[in-house]
């Protein structure tokens, strides 16, 4: 019985091995029928703001009138590709991402305006826009060439306490300098006045007034 079970398992493996090339050939032949390529354009380079916000536009050439669209933002760093955010929306409705997503966006016709927030220098990389026209059939898929987003971390602001200490030290230095300058000036003024005064008061006798000159008045007769 064990030998019979082993033979059945071996036969199933052989059957799966034989049908695998047929399955692969089926997908290669019929996937292009259900999935059609679509051109997606996006800017080549974007510089994030000092607050870590980067915005760019994804524009796709829609061959038909799609009513359901899915937008996905992929990040490629070195050889790794990770999904940043994704959203599915109906044409004419607002583009809404998840509440915890770092992405926001709006749609207008065949354009999707994307904004990525909370970026840091370590998030610098190639951000690829992937657009899928989900409904109605046929299914269209378009992948852009990517937007290189550069993020520069702002320089940290100096500590406010440290600035207060510097201000206090400068103020103290200026006060001490002004006090020293005033003391030196007063000392020089006192040294200049010391030779003029002995510091002893002597009562001097009053001087006799000069004799007043006697003038004889005279009259001029008038005829």
Curated annotation (Swiss-Prot):
Which keywords does the record carry? Adaptive immunity, Cell membrane, Diabetes mellitus, Disease variant, Disulfide bond, Glycoprotein, Immunity, Immunoglobulin domain, Membrane, Pharmaceutical, Phosphoprotein, Signal, Systemic lupus erythematosus, Transmembrane, Transmembrane helix
Where does this protein reside within or beyond the cell?
Cell membrane
Which residue ranges are assigned to the Cytoplasmic compartment in the record's topology? 183-223
Annotated positions of the Phosphotyrosine modification: 201
Segments for region (Important for interaction with CD80 and CD86)? 134-139
Matching Gene3D superfamilies: Immunoglobulins
One Pfam annotation reads V-set
Give the consequence of mutating residue 47 to D: Strongly reduced interaction with CD80, CD86 and ICOSLG
Question: Mind listing the GO biological process terms from this record?
Answer: adaptive immune response; B cell receptor signaling pathway; DNA damage response; immune response; negative regulation of B cell proliferation; negative regulation of regulatory T cell differentiation; negative regulation of T cell proliferation; positive regulation of apoptotic process
Q: Where is this region: Homodimerization?
A: 46-50, 150-155
What does its PTM field state? N-glycosylation is important for dimerization. Phosphorylation at Tyr-201 prevents binding to the AP-2 adapter complex, blocks endocytosis, and leads to retention of CTLA4 on the cell surface.
Q: What is the effect of changing residue 139 to A/D?
A: Strongly reduced interaction with CD80, CD86 and ICOSLG
Q: How does it sit in the membrane?
A: Single-pass type I membrane protein
Instruction: Please provide, in alphabetical order, the Gene Ontology terms of the cellular component aspect for this entry.
Output: clathrin-coated endocytic vesicle; external side of plasma membrane; Golgi apparatus; perinuclear region of cytoplasm; plasma membrane; protein complex involved in cell adhesion
Give the Ig-like V-type domain ranges.
39-140
**Signal peptide (UniProt feature, chain positions):** 1-35
Q: State how changing residue 132 to A/R affects the protein, per the record.
A: Strongly reduced interaction with CD80, CD86 and ICOSLG
Intervals, Extracellular compartment: 36-161
Tissues in which the UniProt entry reports expression: Widely expressed with highest levels in lymphoid tissues. Detected in activated T-cells where expression levels are 30- to 50-fold less than CD28, the stimulatory coreceptor, on the cell surface following activation.
Residues modified by glycosylation: 113, 145
Q: Which disease is it linked to?
A: Systemic lupus erythematosus: A chronic, relapsing, inflammatory, and often febrile multisystemic disorder of connective tissue, characterized principally by involvement of the skin, joints, kidneys and serosal membranes. It is of unknown etiology, but is thought to represent a failure of the regulatory mechanisms of the autoimmune system. The disease is marked by a wide range of system dysfunctions, an elevated erythrocyte sedimentation rate, and the formation of LE cells in the blood or bone marrow.
**Which miscellaneous remark does the UniProt record hold?**
The therapeutic antibody Ipilimumab competes for the binding site of the endogenous ligands CD80/B7-1, CD86/B7-2 and ICOSLG.
Functional description taken from the UniProt entry: Inhibitory receptor acting as a major negative regulator of T-cell responses. The affinity of CTLA4 for its natural B7 family ligands, CD80 and CD86, is considerably stronger than the affinity of their cognate stimulatory coreceptor CD28.
Quaternary structure and partners = Homodimer; disulfide-linked. Binds to CD80/B7-1 and CD86/B7.2. Interacts with ICOSLG.
Which named protein is this?
A: Cytotoxic T-lymphocyte protein 4
Organism in which the protein naturally occurs = Homo sapiens
């Amino acid at each position: 019985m064990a030998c019979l079970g082993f033979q059945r398992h071996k036969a199933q493996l052989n059957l799966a091995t034989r049908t695998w090339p047929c399955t692969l050939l089926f997908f290669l032949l019929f996937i292009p029928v259900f999935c059609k390529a679509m051109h997606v354009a996006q800017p080549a380079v974007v510089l994030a703001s000092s607050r870590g916000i980067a915005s760019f536009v994804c524009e796709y050439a829609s061959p038909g009138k799609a009513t359901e669209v899915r937008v996905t933002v992929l990040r490629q760093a070195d050889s790794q590709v990770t999904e940043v955010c994704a959203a599915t929306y109906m044409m004419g409705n607002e583009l809404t991402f998840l509440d915890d997503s770092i992405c926001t966006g709006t749609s207008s016709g065949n354009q999707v305006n994307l904004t990525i927030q909370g970026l840091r220098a370590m998030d610098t990389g190639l951000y690829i826009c992937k657009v899928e026209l989900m409904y109605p059939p046929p299914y269209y898929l378009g992948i852009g060439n990517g937007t290189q987003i550069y993020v520069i971390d702002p320089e940290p602001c100096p500590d406010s306490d440290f600035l207060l200490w510097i201000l206090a030290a400068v103020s103290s230095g200026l006060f001490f300098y002004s006090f020293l300058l005033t003391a030196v000036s007063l000392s020089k003024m006192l040294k200049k006045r010391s030779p003029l005064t002995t510091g002893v008061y002597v009562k001097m006798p009053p001087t006799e007034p000069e004799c007043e000159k006697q003038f004889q008045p005279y009259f001029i007769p008038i005829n």
